[in-house]
């Protein structure tokens, strides 16, 4: 069905206005063209092509520009939900096309992202405790009562952490200072692929550091709460 002159003008003006807005916000021409589906000049387009371009761009919703890159607001919200307080512009994929290939797009909403993170952290916590308990079982014959008591206290402290706090505990900014940077946890909640890699070479080092780190983590959380009340 052919567009009326008014419909044609509305669609062309919308596309042109969107392009100019992105330019004013600092997006590069290459990024804008990628966002516009490879289109640049909307004059002379057939009604069918114009309608398709209009529907496609409008369906992408609101946009945000970081640096000279274009992202949909929906993608940015999901990225912020995924990284939490660790979010920074550098965490975003570099460019609109890359963002469209991001794993975050498998989530339909911010709620789904948060639910996935919660489930991932919960499973990671359970698997981590299991690995520590297995290590404790294999080493308890040494007969060191003080070490065994400290070990149980450490596991108890981890158990009391919420799943989200455990996620911060395992991957937090201080983790590299206590050698957790080489402990990798990956959990895919769909059950198809679940992996836990616990490096034996780090076992003793982790034993020495986890108690210190958990205490530091609790201290940091208290300090953060006090700052929040001011």
From Swiss-Prot:
Keywords: Covalent protein-DNA linkage, DNA replication, Host nucleus, Virion
GO cellular component, one term: host cell nucleus
Example of a GO biological process term: DNA replication
Compartment annotation: Host nucleus; Virion
Motif (Nuclear localization signal): 222-230
Coiled-coil ranges from the UniProt annotation: none
Entry keyword annotation includes Secreted: no
Function field: DNA terminal protein is linked to the 5'-ends of both strands of the genome through a phosphodiester bond between the beta-hydroxyl group of a threonine residue and the 5'-phosphate of the terminal deoxyadenylate. This protein is essential for DNA replication and is involved in the priming of DNA elongation.
Protein name: Terminal protein
Lineage of the organism: Viruses, Duplodnaviria, Heunggongvirae, Uroviricota, Caudoviricetes
Gene: 4
